[in-house]
């Protein structure tokens, strides 16, 4: 089967591209990813990144990275650096140099002058509030500004005064002269330029007038020779203005805009404004808090580039907005880590076991696999002594027939080791179990017990093979599926979205991590047996205190039968 041919035939965007390329044999596919440098990328941006760069690869075309930096009030160099890092982390390389809309400010200014000279733009002195009031509603037409019918010469002179800084912020703006009764509100004389007196991160203090996004975006696409301008559905109405500007300026190239559905993820918020509220209220730690779906947060949580790209492939590209199951995202990373993560044992909530029939100097070594199905991943050594730790949840004092782990008077097998029998417990002054006294059957290594009944298996670590560690158990930040739709989304915060545990990992494994702790670009993943998949948190870890973030649990709750595996360019 020709996979590329199948991909090209199954996606509405690919069908459009195929048609365009077939009708114009000299056409080369050229697209772009155009973020505004006013925040950090999230999983929704990843869908757009994957789509644009994968299509460029599929059609042997090009994909630019262009920062639409037309609002210096909200932009920052740190966002530019972060966005570039995230794209590279996902494994993509843009064509040529990084581009900025600000590189085209002079050309955009000249296009604005063109519109004025054609009688299609005018300088307005209405305030922002008045412009909103004059615009009308979906049910009522707008009304003309009293400044709408100025002469062309007057508008040329006023626009030049705007450029020179003769007006204060909000005192004047340039508006397109289209139709204040248009059924599309965006076509009711939209603002094209506004005055902002602030230093720009690229052009410094050269300009004090800045083009609006809608004006700069389509013209930047044209200047760069973009053939297919792909954006999400919220820009569908903007297409009218996109095409109007191109039609009424002397551009030599006409890109085409196409829309696809944005990515909406269960139990998540993608809005920058709302995430900032969560940060300001100390509900989350920052933009890389593993409970939110920014790319930096997902990376810190242990998600890999390939798992995110696989997720984007599975959800595909359609024109229908829907809410994507979070369990599908978890499925993608779990499937990968099941193949690649080193197996080791960790105790998150330790309780001590004393094996009374073993001497204090008793020591035995076991060689265990780093992965049960991949011998090439090697092995590591664990030691067995008369004092070990198990997880508190693996012991029950009172008899419970349904409980299959260690119980008083019952037996259990230790992973890779012997069967032990719980005979007595010791408690501290608060009534908590501090020690379990057990008998170790040394005849059961790799063998069944005398009664021929194999008990359940639990994990453990020898007291002499421990290194203390902190474990962060992350869960959904919200307890409803679609918090974005709630007016007061803060009412639905999951109070148990982060639980911290303090326990132990295998000493040798921990010491190897400590050697690498200064290099926070190294990604190390583990399956803590019977617990879940974890990664080292290089931000919070110190040499004397390792911190692990739970990436995902062991149990897969996503029903893969609900959706066929789809390439990023599939429906």
UniProtKB/Swiss-Prot annotation:
Motif 'KMSKS' region per UniProt: ranges: 269-273
Annotated transmembrane regions: none
GO CC field: cytosol
Swiss-Prot/TrEMBL keywords: Aminoacyl-tRNA synthetase, ATP-binding, Cytoplasm, Ligase, Nucleotide-binding, Protein biosynthesis
A Pfam entry, by short name: tRNA-synt_1c
Binding site for ATP: 36-38, 42-48, 232, 262-263, 270-272
Chain sites annotated for binding L-glutamine: 68, 213
EC number: 6.1.1.18
Gene3D superfamilies: Glutamyl-trna Synthetase, Domain 2, Glutamyl-tRNA Synthetase, Domain 3, HUPs, Ribosomal Protein L25, Chain P
Reaction it catalyzes: tRNA(Gln) + L-glutamine + ATP = L-glutaminyl-tRNA(Gln) + AMP + diphosphate
GO molecular function: ATP binding; glutamine-tRNA ligase activity
Chain ranges for the short sequence motif 'HIGH' region as given in the UniProt record: 35-45
Locations listed in the record: Cytoplasm
One Gene Ontology biological process: glutamyl-tRNA aminoacylation
Major subcellular site: cytoplasm
Subunit structure: Monomer.
PANTHER family documented for this protein: GLUTAMATE--TRNA LIGASE (PTHR43097:SF5), GLUTAMINE-TRNA LIGASE (PTHR43097)
Record NCBIfam families: glnS, PRK14703.1
Family: Belongs to the class-I aminoacyl-tRNA synthetase family.
Name of the protein described by the UniProt record: Glutamine--tRNA ligase
Organism for this UniProt entry: Buchnera aphidicola subsp. Acyrthosiphon pisum (strain Tuc7)
Organismal lineage: Bacteria, Pseudomonadati, Pseudomonadota, Gammaproteobacteria, Enterobacterales
Underlying gene: glnS
